[in-house]
């Protein structure tokens, strides 16, 4: 029999401790259930090849002797002890706790061998129960830790895998039922959103027109301006404003918020119309001045130049211009008198523009004294030069009852009752806008009266 390299504690001697048999394989190979290749002939077993390759200390533990349970005496058994017998039989199904009488070699301070034979359900140990259900991975981890650190105390805790229990914080969130919305409220909200989409479209069109008036239109001749796009956008705004005024205002808080948003968008569109009309008035006046000075060419830029002739008599055909094949009857006047054609077109444009502007102000609820259309002089010189254009704006409370009027008062820098702006240069946006519109209208219609065009 080979001796274990593990030294016995000093308190035991060869006389008190009987010789015991050791395992044929080391603890590591036995726990992993692999073949242990070591030296069996030597008294002190050498380290096996696997432990040497792993760099671990090779330990051979002793075999636990077979435990013989004492047979109970049938004569001593009584019916009173049947309950104890049932308890004993039920307790045999669980592994016994090692006591002082069970021969277990706990490692001393100078050794690192750990005897875990009572955890091994293999055939080397003849236990009356089949298995204790200990995971082999846990045992291997304990052995590797004890061998690697060289400690003698058993510090590894055997933790069995815990079952997957449902977390107390995980719960299925049930969707709360959405509050029921009446059909009338839902219809009102849908109508307000559709109205906002329409106003947004008009706003984008007006912004594009304002850019074209400032950049593209000055490069063209006055009778080629696409004025229909501006008038149609102004008319669509008027339709949306009338649609907004027909909707009810007592349809809930959300409907009120949507109405306020639409009102801000409508005021923005109105401001764009005012700016476009102001820029267009300046452009019309500039083109009329050029036409009056003889610098404006007829339609399509074809100015007729009679061919040189030595004859004194010229035919009327020689003095007629070359007409464009696509010429309409409405543009025929531009060939005969370009200046009068430009002046007549400008007067018509201003009349239609002021009329659409006045109707939009009425649909928005803007009082005439605060609007722009009523402050523009159409054919009459009602305002003297340098007169304060903001003086006609009244401060009465009834003029500021409409929400659009209050919003417009905040937008214009010279609000109601402002008497500090005495000139167009020192005034705010509203004063400058009114000054430009009044000046352009006064000069254009003054020329029209001189040529008997203004009624």
Curated annotation (Swiss-Prot):
Domain of life: Eukaryota
Compartments in which it is found: Nucleus
Pfam families, alphabetized: Zn_clus (PF00172)
Gene Ontology terms: cellular component: nucleus
Low complexity bias locations: 89-113
Disulfide bridge map: none
Gene Ontology MF terms in the entry: DNA binding; DNA-binding transcription factor activity, RNA polymerase II-specific; zinc ion binding
Region (Disordered): 1-22, 68-113, 296-317
DNA-binding stretch(es), residue numbering of this chain: 26-58
Residues annotated as signal peptide: none
Record's keyword annotation contains Transport: no
Polar residues compositional bias, start-end: 75-88
Presence of the UniProt keyword Transcription regulation in the record: yes
Biotechnology: Monacoline K acts as an inhibitor of HMG-CoA reductase involved in cholesterogenesis. Its hypocholesterolemic activity might be useful for lowering cholesterol levels in the blood and reduce artherosclerosis and coronary heart disease.
Record SMART domains: GAL4
General function of this protein: Transcription factor that regulates the gene cluster that mediates the biosynthesis of monakolin K, also known as lovastatin, and which acts as a potent competitive inhibitor of HMG-CoA reductase. Monakolin K biosynthesis is performed in two stages. The first stage is catalyzed by the nonaketide synthase mokA, which belongs to type I polyketide synthases and catalyzes the iterative nine-step formation of the polyketide.
Full protein name: Transcription factor mokH
UniProt source species: Monascus pilosus
């Amino acid at each position: 029999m080979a001796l274990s390299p593990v030294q016995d504690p000093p308190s035991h001697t060869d006389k008190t401790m009987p010789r015991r048999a050791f395992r044929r394989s080391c603890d590591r190979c036995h726990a992993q259930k692999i073949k242990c290749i070591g030296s069996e002939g030597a008294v002190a077993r050498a380290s096996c090849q696997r432990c040497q390759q792993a760099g671990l200390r090779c330990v051979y533990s002793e075999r636990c002797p077979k435990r013989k349970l004492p047979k109970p005496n049938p004569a001593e058994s009584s019916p009173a002890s049947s309950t104890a017998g049932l308890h004993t039989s039920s307790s045999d199904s669980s592994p016994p706790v090692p006591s002082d009488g069970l021969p277990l070699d706990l490692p001393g301070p100078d050794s690192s061998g750990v005897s875990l034979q009572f955890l091994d359900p293999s055939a080397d140990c003849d236990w009356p129960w089949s298995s204790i259900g200990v995971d082999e991975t846990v045992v291997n981890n304990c052995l590797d830790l004890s061998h690697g650190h060289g400690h003698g105390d058993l510090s590894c805790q055997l933790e069995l895998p815990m079952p997957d229990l449902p977390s107390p914080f995980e719960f299925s969130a049930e969707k709360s039922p959405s509050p029921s919305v009446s059909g009338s409220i839902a219809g009102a909200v849908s109508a307000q959103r559709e109205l906002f989409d329409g106003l947004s479209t008009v706003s984008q069109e007006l912004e594009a027109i304002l850019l074209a008036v400032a950049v593209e239109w000055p490069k063209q001749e006055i009778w080629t301006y696409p004025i229909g796009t501006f008038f149609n956008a102004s008319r669509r705004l008027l339709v949306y404003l009338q649609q907004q005024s027909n909707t009810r205002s007592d349809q809930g808080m959300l409907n009120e918020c949507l109405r306020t948003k639409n009102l801000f968008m409508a005021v923005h569109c109105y401001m764009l119309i005012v700016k476009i009309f102001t820029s267009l008035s300046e452009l019309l006046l500039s083109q009329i001045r050029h036409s009056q000075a003889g610098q404006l060419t007829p339609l399509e830029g074809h100015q007729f130049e009679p061919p040189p002739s030595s004859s004194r008599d010229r035919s009327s055909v020689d003095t007629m211009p070359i007409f464009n094949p696509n010429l309409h009857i409405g543009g025929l006047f531009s060939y005969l008198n370009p200046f009068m054609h430009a002046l007549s077109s400008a007067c018509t444009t201003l009349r239609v523009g002021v009329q659409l502007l006045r109707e939009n102000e009425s649909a928005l609820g803007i009082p005439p004294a605060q609007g722009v259309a009523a402050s523009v002089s159409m054919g009459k010189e009602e305002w003297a030069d340098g007169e304060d254009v903001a003086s006609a704006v009244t401060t009465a409370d009834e003029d500021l009852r409409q929400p659009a009027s209050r919003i417009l008062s905040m937008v214009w820098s010279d609000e109601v009752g402002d008497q500090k702006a005495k000139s167009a240069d020192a005034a705010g946006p509203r004063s400058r806008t009114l000054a430009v519109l009044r000046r352009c209208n006064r000069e254009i219609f003054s020329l029209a009266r001189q040529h008997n065009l203004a009624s």
